[in-house]
Amino acid sequence: ENTLPQKSELFVSLPDYCPTPDGMAIAPNGDLILACPNFADITQPACLMRITKDGAVSKWLDVPVLEETGWASPMGLAFNEEGDLFISDNQGWSGAEKAKNKGRVLRLKFENDQLKETITVASGMEHPNGIRIRNGKLYVTQSSLSQIKDPSGLLVSGVYCFDMNDRDIAVTNTSADQNLLTTVITKNPEVQYGLDGIVFNEAGDLFVGNFGDGAIHRIKMDAEGKVVSNDVWAQDTTQLRT
């Protein structure tokens, strides 16, 4: 196994209408789809970019906005086997009061590469971020769950699990949420920002990045999808930078 550092090089430069690149996913045809929430320039509508294997860049579509706020904030992306695209819409990232607890998980359905239908899988989320699909389930990180109080006073974040065909699940961002799979505490008081990236290995173990702690947690589940362990799998506190 090659453990040596690999050389990186610039693949593409993005146009001005994508000042904030974020989540990525490979489309069924092999193109790279890139979410651009565009927090760095809110005059630019949040969009999805299409990047071909040879580096051709184009705008695919503007992400459907939430009527109450007038914007979208796409971050994590994941395709299912049918080619539907699931998006974590992190409305609350802006800090605007009208966007508080207005995050969504969206399902975009397509016909001939054109957006046909937008389905709201879940709404009312505080800080939805990463998203992955496994065995018909959606796993979504929430980087902040401020309504769940730990005795330490430190930040709680978590992972939610939805059925891929769910619609209009009302999330409360509390421990009463039936879709809340597991939670973690971010122990670094200088960076109170929780779970972010998310991925499965072939064995079905779920790995999530705890941003503030610079740690990766491994979450193991039983055959019914219940969490049996949630432990820090990798961390080097000497590498933390604020």
Give the ranges of each region predicted by the language model.
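Short loop/turn segments immediately following the C-termini of beta-strands
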Residues: 37-39, 90-92, 100, 143-146, ...
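Beta-rich, blade/repeat-based domains predominating
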Residues: 16-31, 35-38, 44-45, 65-85, ...
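A short loop-to-beta-strand structural motif that recurs across blades of beta-propeller domains
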Residues: 45-49, 103-106, 158-160, 215-217
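Histidine/lysine/aspartate-rich catalytic loop segments that bind and position anionic ligands
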Residues: 142-189
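C-terminal closing repeat unit and adjoining cap/tail of repeat-based domains
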Residues: 217-242
